[in-house]
Amino acid sequence: MNRLLVIAGPTASGKTALAVALARRLGGEIVNADSQQVYRGLDVGTAKPTAAERAAVPHHLLDVAEAGEGMDAARFAALADAAIADVAARGRLPIVAGGTGLYLRALLHGVVAAPGRDAALRARLEEEAARLGRPALHARLAALDPDAAARIRPNDLVRIVRALEIAAGGTRPSELYARHAFREDRYAARLLALDPPRASLHARIDARVAEMFAGGLLEEARALAARFGDALPPKLPIGYAEAIGCVRGELQLAEAVRRVQVAHRRYARRQVIWLRRERGVEWIAPPFDADDLARRVENG
């Protein structure tokens, strides 16, 4: 079983910088576990590692898919497995860095064996969501499987559609998850989660979002709008819909910045809640001392 170090935590908590620092000290390479950083061309709005960080330490699973291309936890886990095996085979330490809970869970504990995808049904459900609204599909799921609906936010179209797709095959999604229970340990993983105080995290989030809008997010949004027109991908990373609204003249810049700051703060809260439910998490309070953490990792 391959040894693995995982650096998790809420957005803007400093995962990337710490992962790079630890990789340099421990002879590691970084495997991305951020569901939005896999997409090419979405760099500023997803806070990808800088060119300097990527030059300092090898990174894997960045820019492996096109915007709008399907990427789910199962595909991510398969790609990550291959990257981790490659890093370990060269005598390096794989360091998984990211805050996407579904991806981390799939990698560490496996994925649920669910019925295959039905492209026609998915297209029909997505059309209904566009016509009736996502909450209408969520309500339909709640009628079929209240437990599954309770675990999915009413605006999370990707997960709602997948749950309805499973239910259409005669299986309750909640029963599938209950049977799996994510008990399997696929790696000898040490999971460190960064735990900054809420006030300082919110300040970092607000500053980062302002920097995104000043540092190229609008240009990325303009390129997306030119590429896709009115047929934008249904699940863009946080901030791109608002930035596209700005470049189209539908939203004032200050209001767009405010909305994205709020969205990132809410996302950070969900990430923390997710990690609190996971087993084996070591919470790390600031300051995040890379030398101290490297010694702790080396000493087991």
Swiss-Prot record:
Q: List the Pfam families.
A: IPPT (PF01715)
At the top of the EC hierarchy, this enzyme's class is transferase
Instruction: List required co-factors.
Output: Mg(2+)
* Residues reported in the UniProt entry to bind ATP: 9-16
This protein's source sits in the domain of life called Bacteria
Identify the residue position(s) of the site Interaction with substrate tRNA: 100, 122
Q: Which UniProt keywords apply?
A: ATP-binding, Magnesium, Nucleotide-binding, Transferase, tRNA processing
Please name the GO terms that the record assigns under molecular function. ATP binding; tRNA dimethylallyltransferase activity
> Which BP terms from GO are recorded?
tRNA modification
Q: Does the keyword ATP-binding apply?
A: yes
Where does the record place the region Interaction with substrate tRNA?
A: 34-37
Q: What is its EC number?
A: 2.5.1.75
Reaction(s) the record says it catalyses: adenosine(37) in tRNA + dimethylallyl diphosphate = N(6)-dimethylallyladenosine(37) in tRNA + diphosphate
Which residues of this UniProt protein bind substrate? Answer: 11-16
Q: How does it assemble?
A: Monomer.
- What NCBIfam families has UniProt attached to this entry? miaA
- Purpose: Catalyzes the transfer of a dimethylallyl group onto the adenine at position 37 in tRNAs that read codons beginning with uridine, leading to the formation of N6-(dimethylallyl)adenosine (i(6)A).
Q: Which family does it belong to?
A: Belongs to the IPP transferase family.
Q: What is the protein name given in its UniProt record? A: tRNA dimethylallyltransferase
